[in-house]
A protein has these predicted regions:
Chain B
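N-terminal export/assembly segments and adjacent metallocofactor-ligating motifs
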Residues: 1-219, 254, 415-418
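N-terminal, charge-rich interaction modules
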Residues: 12-13, 17-29, 257-258, 286-304
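Residues in well-ordered beta-strands of folded domains
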Residues: 33, 251, 284
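Non-catalytic alpha/beta scaffold blocks inside enzyme catalytic domains
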Residues: 127-279, 304-306, 310-418
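Flexible, glycine/charged-enriched surface loops at secondary-structure junctions
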Residues: 278-286
Length: 552, 418
């Protein structure tokens, strides 16, 4: 039996209603245990003066896969500028917005994160995604499978095959790709771009299948609900980045018709067309709609100033954005009757009207959405900025005077267009614990994560109290992963690997022959080759399979 | 080991739907007959792969140190000893699965030295454009179903990618209204390619030797609506066809292009870029034998750089010229030669050689250490990437010839060093 006592800290565990409770946290054999159950001799960490929280959970961060490798390829200057020196626990990687696998695990762990989820697994690339994620140390991972532009699904919907057939297909794909949730990226739009459509509105028909994004969205919302997946549809909506898309976003919220829906990087979908530059903040309207619709959750996709690279499955949007690539190069790919990707390097500048307003819109969303359990802290890494900017973002949320200082640096034209100064709210530590841990665990259905109650996994973080919240959250004093101390005084001291979360909903076996035929005739290789086996996930060790309603 | 689909009375087994790892097309309809350690490929396989899959019943050769047979442990120890004195090692060949490459990265990071794949010339011709300017590319299934006009730029790639047309441009495709049109620009199809293309319309646009770059520049001007200077190859009909196509694809085998390959690719990419303003088009840049693409991908996610990366003092840097296998080898004291997919010979050099190589490799000069390794997809399971970069294919184990994997050999050498 291995045991660890984290003593004398103030426990901040919103999921269990504990706010600054002074108590010891005991981890026995990798799990949180009752205070009384610690053996006599136990390794003790002195957390006096520290805040003790569960390990951080990032619900949306592009950490792996083909698009990340393309980004690394395009950003070789960044790779040269940020090298990770070889050390006892360090690899030989580097990068910031294009961080390599080992460095990703290290930088997240140092900030106190122990689980990070890849939100855009293109099915054809799932095997690569899992292989790469297995090289990321410290973190639990899992993938959201991108559906909604795949020809098989659009054909099912267009041909009126019915909800049951869709459910079987979605379940088959989740099993084949070993993913944990369903993501939709620009529903039907990526597919439409392959048929040369350049725009896709919520009620516009796909040029080939003649079905609308609304239909695709509603069908997949129903599928995940009926399969009983914990996480709702994770939606990157139509018209990303387009001025005036606030209306699309409001219409999309309405289209959910009260069913659970998670809308991602909503900052990029909260733009109005007011003002002399025809670009304005829609944050107030969107926040109001989120506040009124308890079925909706969002993550923000905050923009942070500096060089980054945008990587998305939404080639339709990225092709529109190619002209603003900085440096001036970009890569797009159509992918396997499945989806696509577009990688466009970009530098957000505080003196740019548009970028400065994007920054303000993100913060307005954070501050105007009232329920911290339905909003999650993200920069859509690396699209709004690298995840290493989270401590700075936390300070912006918690420290109004700091926020106002930063606001004063913005392009004057943007300041005139934002109401940010009128918002007095400051996030409390408890709210930070909610948006970075408790709420992500809840929306993902990870019942044994994001809290410090008995039975939870032993992912525990100690932060030293510091009025400078950016400093406080940049380097945790201690990080414990599954009961092992991995960070001590901000330094990595051990190397462990996390687990891969997935769901395995049941499906009607008759779909197998249909998929075999689809792969033989259309895709051009075998469905049997496409399916990922259990042995391929972390060598057959380290999967966590979550229960669904339709379980096998 | 996977369950054989048909067992034979002879004690042999027939395995269906075997994935072929050699050229990068990732065909997975090969039938293998395995009897003891003997292997024969049957249906599905192309001529080249059949030869590469074939194995005799003889036992695998022993490891050797300085030409003398040695136990595996002794060979591992000898390799570790050599590397512990290495000043400037070069890791080359790199014919290995993803796990093998992962272990080579770890070892190279500790010993220092550079890493390249023996077939990377074409990959770097492609990267010269994709890295500096970018492109719009596509994958095999997109071509198969969307592409109504397939333009082969330069020599026929099916020389290297044997079943290319059968796999990628078959007679029918989901969104094709009529027969697919295949244009060979500056090359011509082999007889076998013609057979694979039956049902498609074939057109050949001859380009005089050395004038492909010029032809593509003219094509680019034409699709942009400009009028190129008079003379040269007649390209207006092709330009019109490209503009009228629903989904045109320009494909090339980068390794098969000439010395001006970089420029050919850059011009072809520009044509696709222009077409995409009004219609849809994409590139299919082919490169990728012996898991070249997988090695490059593994480098990108672990190191951040593509192949041709050097390690010094634990820090990696990338230099396409200096760390290319051939140039790095000029100043190398030790060559670690890795070739698990085929008996590829190490290049001539003055360096001492540690060969983690196919058992049938015939060396021009006996390596200081020879460790025969198994082939991913025959002797052990593994992972390899397809030429289109997106799809990777699982390789399975079909026999036990007592051969160690590259990953295992490198891991043990690494442990022996410390």
């Amino acid at each position: 039996m291995s045991a660890l006592r984290i003593a004398n800290g103030k426990v901040l565990d919103p999921a269990n209603g504990e706010v600054g409770v002074e108590r010891d946290v005991i981890v026995v054999d990798g799990k949180i245990a009752d205070a009384g159950s610690a053996p006599a001799s136990v390794e003790t960490i002195d957390a006096k003066g520290g805040i003790v929280m569960a390990g951080g959970i990032d619900i949306h961060s592009h950490i792996a896969g083909g698009k990340s490798n393309i980004a690394r390829l395009l950003m070789v200057e960044e790779q040269r500028a940020f090298r990770e020196p070889q050390g006892p626990f360090c690899g030989c990687g580097g990068g910031l917005s294009t961080m390599t696998a080992h460095a990703t695990g290290c930088r997240y762990a140092e900030m106190g994160y122990t689980a990070v989820f890849e939100p855009a697994v293109v099915a054809a690339n799932a095997r690569h995604m899992h292989t790469e994620m297995a090289d990321i140390p410290f973190l639990d991972t899992g993938g959201y499978l991108v559906l909604g532009n795949d020809d098989f699904l659009l054909d099912l919907i267009a041909s009126g095959a019915g909800q049951q057939a869709v459910n079987d297909y979605v379940a088959w794909q989740l099993n084949a790709t070993k993913c944990m949730a369903i993501k939709i990226v620009n529903p039907g739009g990526i597919n439409a771009f392959k048929f040369n459509a350049r725009w896709m509105q919520l009620d516009e028909k796909n040029p080939h299948y003649e079905i609308t994004p609304r239909t695709i969205l509603q069908t997949l919302i129903r599928a995940v609900t009926e399969l009983g997946l914990a996480h709702p549809i994770h939606l990157h909506g139509c018209n990303l980045g387009v001025p005036g898309n606030e209306q699309t976003t409001l219409d999309t919220i309405a289209a959910a018709e009260g069913m659970p829906l998670h809308m991602t990087h909503v900052q990029f979908h909260s733009y109005g067309t007011e003002g002399d530059r025809k670009f304005s903040s829609g944050a107030a309207k969107i926040a109001e709609a989120v506040n009124k619709n308890p079925n909706i959750s969002i993550d923000v996709g905050q923009v942070m100033f500096g060089q980054t690279v945008t990587a998305s499955a939404d080639l339709m949007s990225q092709h529109r954005n190619r002209g603003i690539a900085s440096p001036g190069r970009w890569i797009g790919m159509d992918i396997e009757m499945d989806a696509a990707c577009g990688i466009v390097p970009f530098a957000y500048k505080d003196k740019s009207f548009v970028n400065a307003l994007q920054w303000a819109i993100g913060l307005e969303l954070f501050l105007l959405v009232e329920d911290p359990w339905r909003i999650f802290l993200t920069t859509d890494h690396p699209n709004g900025g690298p995840f290493t900017t989270y401590p700075h973002l936390i300070r912006l949320l918690m420290d109004r005077s700091f926020r106002e200082e930063q606001f004063a640096k913005l392009a004057k034209s943007a300041r005139k267009h934002s109401n940010l100064l009128e918002i007095k709210r400051e996030y409390t530590l408890e709210e930070i614990a909610i948006v970075t841990r408790a709420a992500p665990a809840k929306i993902l259905g990870l019942t044994d994560r994001g809290h410090l109650g008995a039975g939870a996994v032993g992912d525990v973080v100690v932060y030293r109290e510091d009025a400078d919240r950016e400093a406080m959250f940049s380097r945790a004093a201690y990080v414990v992963k599954d009961g092992t101390v991995i960070v001590r005084e901000g330094e990595i001291v051990d190397l462990v690997y996390g687990r891969t979360h997935q769901v395995t909903p049941d499906y009607d076996a008759s779909i197998e022959t249909k998929m075999d035929r689809w792969f033989d005739e259309t895709i051009g290789y075998k469905a049997g080759t496409y399916k990922i086996s259990d042995e391929e996930i972390r060598g057959g060790q380290g999967s966590v399979k979550h229960a669904t309603v339709r379980a096998s | 080991m996977t369950e054989p689909s048909v067992s034979e009375a002879s004690g042999g087994a027939t395995h269906k739907d075997v994935v072929c790892p050699y050229c990068g097309l990732g065909c997975d309809d090969v039938t293998l007959e395995v009897s003891g350690t003997a292997v024969e490929a049957k249906e599905g396989v192309c001529g080249r792969a059949a030869a590469l899959f074939r194995r005799g019943a003889e036992p695998a050769p022993s490891a050797r140190v300085n030409g003398r047979e040695a136990p595996l442990d002794a060979a591992i120890a000898a390799a570790a000893e050599l590397l512990s004195h290495a000043r400037s090692p070069v890791y080359a060949g790199l014919g290995a699965d993803v796990d093998g490459v992962r272990q080579i990265i770890k070892l190279a990071a500790r010993t220092g030295g550079s890493v390249d794949h023996y077939a990377s010339t074409g990959l770097f011709r492609n990267l010269a454009t994709s890295q500096r300017r970018g492109w719009i590319a596509t994958t095999l299934a997109e071509v198969r179903n969307h592409c109504d006009l397939f333009v082969v730029v330069g020599p026929d790639p099916s020389e290297q990618f044997h079943r290319l047309y059968e796999r990628v441009t078959p007679k029918t495709g989901r969104f094709l209204a009529g027969p697919r049109k295949i244009v060979f620009l500056g090359g011509a199809p082999s007889e076998e390619a013609r057979a694979q293309l039956e049902g498609s319309t074939i057109e050949i646009v001859a380009v005089p030797e050395g004038e492909l770059v010029e032809a593509l520049s003219r094509l680019q001007a034409l699709v942009s609506g400009l009028v190129p200077p008079a003379g040269g190859v007649e390209l207006a009909p092709l330009a019109e066809a490209l503009k009228a196509a629903k989904y045109a694809v320009l494909a090339w085998n980068a390794g098969g292009l000439g010395a001006d390959g970089d420029l050919v690719i850059e011009r072809a990419v520009a044509v696709v870029e222009t077409l995409n303003v009004e219609t849809r088009a994409a590139c299919l840049p082919l490169a990728g034998r012996d898991n070249l693409i997988g090695a490059n991908q593994t480098f990108l996610w672990n190191v951040g750089f593509p192949l041709r990366t050097g390690f010094r003092g634990g820090i990696a840097d990338h230099d396409q010229a200096a760390y290319a296998g051939a140039s790095a080898l000029k100043s190398a004291d030790i060559l670690v030669w890795v070739s698990a997919f085929r008996p590829e010979r190490p290049p001539a050099s003055d360096a001492q050689i540690i060969a983690l190589a196919h058992p049938a490799t015939e060396f021009e000069r006996e390596p200081e250490v020879f460790i025969p390794v198994g082939q991913p997809g025959l002797d052990h399971a593994g992972l390899a990437f397809r030429t289109d970069v997106v799809v990777s294919v699982p390789l399975k184990r079909y026999r036990d010839a007592g051969l160690i994997s590259v990953a295992e050999a490198v891991r043990r050498i690494s442990e022996g060093r410390s």
